[in-house]
């Protein structure tokens, strides 16, 4: 697939612009697109254990797949890097952001926004929701993460500061007393079902 477009000079923000000390803001929720796809394509299996209302909500996650609104707000606040969270999910996107920028990443699992519907759908198929295709979410690097979150929330877009860029190359997820090193995304969790 090839895409062509026009951008004003000086307005391109790449995945590779993150600097040590930058905060990492994540928009919306982990696993959005994957949850929507699974709920639509595996509805019968999900009905065996989950209520129809939850499945319907999960199918509706497709309404969140555009990242244009948050991109515009991020540009107004000022950012160093932006990366859409697609195949490989949140963990894959964090690794890609760090790799493209030549920095380390420290992110906190308990700060990563996730919907209960995603957790429950993933439990049925034994999937890691943080490694599930998450189109509709963005990772944004900036100096003023809390300001960006505030502006996004004012516009009705869920967002959270989930970590920061560090010196070095370690890309880690901190969960309570555990530290997990992440690497390049392998096959997306969606392909396991």
Predicted regions and their residues:
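Helix-biased detector of long, well-ordered alpha-helical tracts
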Residues: 1-193
């Amino acid at each position: 697939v090839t895409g062509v477009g026009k951008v004003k000079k000086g307005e391109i923000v790449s995945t590779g612009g993150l600097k040590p000390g930058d905060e990492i803001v994540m928009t919306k929720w982990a696993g959005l697109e994957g949850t929507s796809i699974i709920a639509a394509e595996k509805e019968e299996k999900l009905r065996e254990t989950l209520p129809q209302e939850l499945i319907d909500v999960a199918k509706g996650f497709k309404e969140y797949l555009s990242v244009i609104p948050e991109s515009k707000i991020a540009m107004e606040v000022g950012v160093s890097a932006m990366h859409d969270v697609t195949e490989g999910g949140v963990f894959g996107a964090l690794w890609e952001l760090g790799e493209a920028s030549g920095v380390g990443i420290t992110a906190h699992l308990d700060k990563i926004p996730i919907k209960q519907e995603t957790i429950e759908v993933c439990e049925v198929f034994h999937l890691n929701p943080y490694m599930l295709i998450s189109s509709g979410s963005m990772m944004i690097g900036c100096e003023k993460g809390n300001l960006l979150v505030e502006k996004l929330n004012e516009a009705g877009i869920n967002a959270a500061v989930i970590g920061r860029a560090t010196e070095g190359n370690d890309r880690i997820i901190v969960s309570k007393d555990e530290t997990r090193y992440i690497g390049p995304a392998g096959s997306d969790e969606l392909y396991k079902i």
